């Protein structure tokens, strides 16, 4: 009986409406942090440097609709693109659902509270800087799981 279950438990990612798809974003902001790639190993290393369009308090894009105008390299996430990238945070709802895992209790869709991602300490709030203020990314590497 699917009527009692939320959409993310009954639909594949490619079956979701645009509104359902967009609501999966928990607002952690971690996908909007710059990463550096080790030239020798190919390993991605996290920084605490956020895209200039990221509102570091809310974890949301300041101009989501026009973001690619200002940040051409910004990825438009789709079910197909999701499988082609390896840098999404381990807590990302898109990634979790694609891997057959449940959403965590702190996810706003589960908790009903958009602040729950921040209260759980899994967002960028409080430990990031804007790329406009950061300088060299190498000076902003963090030993933190994204």
Swiss-Prot record:
Signal peptide: none annotated. InterPro entries: Puta_zinc/iron-chelating_dom, UCP006173. PANTHER family: UPF0260 PROTEIN YCGN. Belongs to the UPF0260 family. This is UPF0260 protein Swit_2819. It comes from Rhizorhabdus wittichii (strain DSM 6014 / CCUG 31198 / JCM 15750 / NBRC 105917 / EY 4224 / RW1) (Sphingomonas wittichii).
